[in-house]
Amino acid sequence: MKSIKRIGLCISLLILIIFATSCGSNKITGDSKEEQIKKSFAKSLDKYPTENLEEFYDKEGYRDGEFEKDDKGTWLIRSEMKIQLKGENLESRGAVIEINRNTRTAKGNYIVREVVEDSDGMTHNHTKRYPVKMENNKMIPLKSIDDEKVKKEIEEFKFFVQYGNFKELENYKEDEVSYNPEVPIYSAQYQLKNSDYNVEQLRKRYNIPTQKAPKLLLKGSGNLKGSSVGYKNIEFTFVENKEENIYFTDSVYFNPSEDK
C-alpha cells in the first residue's frame, strides 16, 4: 500500500513539474519571439540612413539558396506617399529603383497613380510611369518630360532610406507585436509623436493634410533570420478609415538578379 502511495505521489509531482515547466517555457518562448521580431527589424533598419544610394553597390544583403554563386544580387528600393481626402480619389506619388550590383547600374521608375471609382463602384488605376536612372546619387529621367511639376519632383526626390533614421527604435513603445508561424508573417506597431524625427522629415518633404501623429507599422514575412523570398515593409499611417487614407510606405529588398 505504501509503495502504491509513493508511486502515486511521484506521478503527481511529475505532472506538476511538467505543467510548471511547460507554462514557464511558453512564456520564455513568447518573450524570445518578441525579441527576435524586434531584432529582425532592427537588423534591416540599420541601413537607414544611407544618404548616397551608390553605397548599395558595395552593400551585401542576406543570401540563401535562391542566389546563383556568381550573382552579387540586386537591391530593390521603393518609397511612396498615398493620400485620399474625403470625397476624392486616392493619389500616390513615389519611385522604385533597382540597384544591380553585378552591372553597377541603377534604373527604375517615378510613378504617379490615381485610383478612380466609377458610378458602378468599380475602381480603376490610372498610372503614369516615368523611366529613370541613377547617376551620382541623383535620379535622371530617361525620356523628356513635358510636365514641369513631375520633372521637378523627380529632381528633388529622395528615397526614405536616404534620410530615415531608426536609431531610437529600441526606445519606441510598441502598441502590438504579432507573429503567425504558419505563414510566417510578423509585425510590430508603434504610436509616434509629431516630434519624432522621421515624422518631421516626412512632413518636410510632403504636403501631409493632417496634424494627426502617425502609427509606425513594421511588417515582415519569411524566416526571422532572413529570406530572399520574404519582405520587410515600413508604413507610416496618419489616417485610415473608409473615407480618408493618408499613409507612407517604404521598403528595401535584396533579391537575386534577373540578369543571371
From Swiss-Prot:
It comes from Staphylococcus aureus (strain N315). It comes from the Bacteria. Belongs to the staphylococcal tandem lipoprotein family. One of its GO terms (cellular component) is plasma membrane. A lipid is attached at C23 (N-palmitoyl cysteine). This is Uncharacterized lipoprotein SA0404. Residues 1-22 form the signal peptide. The gene is lpl8. A lipid is attached at C23 (S-diacylglycerol cysteine). It is a lipid-anchor. It is found in: Cell membrane. InterPro entries: Csa (IPR007595), Csa_sf (IPR038641). Gene3D superfamilies: 2.50.20.40. Keywords: Cell membrane, Lipoprotein, Membrane, Palmitate, Signal. The lineage of its organism: Bacteria, Bacillati, Bacillota, Bacilli, Bacillales.
